[in-house]
């Protein structure tokens, strides 16, 4: 009967017979929510670390690929130039091919930038929540 009167007054007695201002069940739920929130925060930090490492790896790989593409294009262009120096028709064809390749690379660059922007927005949204 004493516990009921204390509860009416907004006071509660826990399992250790200590006087509390919050119902022990509510306090337990709050502690559980706090623990889950902390666990989620740790998981989010782990995700950020993992995605950051992945992004760095992808950027490094992209730089290597781009370097190799440029090197291959230089070798090909050198070979084509050596062959085409004597033939103006072949020179015009090479110019057209290089123009088309340049346009394709420009479009590819735009697509990659768009994907990068979307990924940055996604990561930003995840870090804000």
Swiss-Prot record:
Annotated InterPro entries: FT20 (IPR028172)
The UniProt record lists the keyword ATP-binding: no
Cellular component terms per the entry's GO annotation: centrosome; ciliary basal body; ciliary base; cilium; cytoplasm; dendrite; intraciliary transport particle; intraciliary transport particle B
Major localization class: other
Keywords attached to this entry: Cell projection, Cilium, Coiled coil
Coiled coil: 89-121
Xref: Pfam families: IFT20 (PF14931)
Compartments reported by the entry: Cell projection, Cilium
Example GO BP: cilium assembly
UniProt keyword Electron transport present: no
Quaternary structure note: Component of the IFT complex B composed of at least che-2, che-13, dyf-1, dyf-3, dyf-6, dyf-11, dyf-13, ift-20, ift-74, ift-81, ifta-2, osm-1, osm-5 and osm-6.
PANTHER family for this protein: INTRAFLAGELLAR TRANSPORT PROTEIN 20 HOMOLOG
Purpose: Component of the intraflagellar transport (IFT) complex B required for transport of proteins in the motile cilium. Required for ciliary entrance and transport of specific ciliary cargo proteins such as che-3 which are related to motility.
Name of the protein this chain belongs to: Intraflagellar transport protein 20 homolog
Provenance organism: Caenorhabditis elegans
């Amino acid at each position: 009967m004493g516990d009921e009167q204390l509860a009416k007054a907004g006071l509660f007695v826990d399992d250790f017979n200590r006087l509390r201002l919050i119902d022990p069940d509510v306090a337990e739920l709050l502690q559980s929510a706090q623990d889950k929130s902390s666990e989620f925060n740790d998981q989010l930090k782990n995700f950020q670390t993992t995605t950051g490492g992945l992004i760095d790896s992808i950027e490094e790989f992209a730089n290597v690929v781009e370097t190799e593409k440029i090197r291959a294009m230089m070798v090909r262009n050198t070979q084509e130039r050596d062959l085409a120096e004597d033939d103006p028709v072949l020179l015009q064809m090479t110019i057209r091919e290089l123009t088309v390749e340049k346009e394709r690379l420009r479009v590819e660059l735009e697509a990659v930038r768009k994907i990068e922007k979307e990924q940055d927005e996604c990561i930003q949204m995840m870090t804000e929540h």
